[in-house]
């Protein structure tokens, strides 16, 4: 059997981690249906899930960027890749900020 790739998954909210409510989709502190879906990937990947926070990305600010960067910096070692889930409203801003905050991170 091939070695499983080790993936660090950091969830921050957004639609991917939302749950339906009578008022529409809402952030879910447990990542919505995402954790259950991860079980399907267990044959090929060893996934470490860190639910960092659960907010609408329209509310993402530099304070959250720092928290995401800190989480990646403190936890990336020993992993083959890092995945950060994020809503689409401010994803480009967060991605840009993290690029500058995490220079030399040699992981996809």
Predicted regions and their residues:
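N-terminal glycine-rich anion-binding loop in soluble enzyme alpha/beta folds
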Residues: 2-76
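Structural motif
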Residues: 80-81
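Short Gly/Thr/Asp-enriched flexible loops that form oxyanion-binding sites at enzyme active sites
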Residues: 84-107
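Hydrophobic structural segments
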Residues: 71, 75-77, 90, 96
């Amino acid at each position: 059997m091939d070695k499983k790739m080790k993936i660090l998954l950091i969830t921050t909210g957004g639609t991917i981690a939302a749950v339906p409510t009578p008022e529409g989709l809402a952030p879910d502190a447990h990542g919505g249906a995402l954790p259950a879906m991860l079980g399907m990937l267990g044959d090929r990947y060893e996934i470490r899930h860190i639910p960092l926070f659960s907010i609408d990305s329209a509310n993402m600010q530099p304070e959250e960027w720092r928290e995401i960067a800190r989480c990646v910096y403190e936890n990336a070692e020993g992993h083959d890749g890092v995945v950060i889930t994020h809503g689409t409203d401010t994803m480009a801003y967060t991605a840009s900020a993290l690029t500058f905050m995490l220079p030399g991170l040699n992981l996809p």
